[in-house]
Amino acid sequence: MARKNQAVVLGLVLVAISAVVLLISWSGDDSNIVRELEEEPTLTVYMNETGEIKEMKLEEYLAGVVAGEMFPDWPVEAYAAQAIFARSFTMDFVSQGGVKDKYGADVSTSIEETQAYTPQAITDDIRRGVEMTRGQVMTYDNRYVRGWFHAYSGGITARAKEGLDYQEEEPPFTKSVRLPENEYAPEEVKAWQVEYSAAELKNLLAARGVNVGDITGVEITERGPTERITKILVKGTQGEQEMTGPEFRLAVDSTKMKSTLVREFAFADGVLRISGTGYGHGVGLSQWDA
């Protein structure tokens, strides 16, 4: 990444912030309306790896999130921008109930449920980036913005319904933006490919509750405005089932099928071959494009 580009992005992020707060009210009606309180909140964090629930201050939790979501050698400005997005996401997520119903906690350490959390990877620069933006969040209409972010857009970002299969009304602050060629993103996120045997697919999909017997076919049935996969039909010896693109990607391991912005998607001779570009859901901040 270029330090100049990161400074510009951070500047744009700061311009978007319409309120600077330290705390949030997490219960009652209109709980995600921005409020300024007197003390830093304490979060309850469900540790998916061990099943325990830990308490920690918001800013300490965010340092672990930034460490889990970014590389350890990026400039402080990049960590600062990421901290604002992560803080905004956390504020909004917890205000809407977090994972209370599932774990009895505010957040979890699952990247699929909330955000990555890797405290052992925290560096001094990461702590600086979090501290220099302490309490800063993005808001829209005096409410916390769900600060979505992903690793690399593949050249174009998506809106929430397309990239995440977001079930609520499309947020007005998410936009699809076409971006210039990226000279900083590594090749493994700019162009990737993966293969799955029919047996692998059967096991992976069954773990997600998709049971159609032996896999006989997988096909894209719908793409969104940015050409990301939005719907997939899985065919098997015991029937067929439709899945959303984001749901399918999570089922087959989102570190292998890096995005739903695919160029090739073909099932032949018992093997599904996929190639594409980008890493992540494509909504919000694209870290490598920053």
Predicted regions and their residues:
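Active-site beta-strand/loop microenvironment that shapes enzyme catalytic pockets
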Residues: 272-290
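Extended substrate/cofactor- or partner-recognition/assembly subdomains adjacent to catalytic sites
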Residues: 92-272
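Acidic/histidine-rich, surface-exposed loop or edge segments in extracytoplasmic proteins
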Residues: 57-75, 107-109, 179-188
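N-terminal Sec-pathway targeting helices
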Residues: 1-16, 24
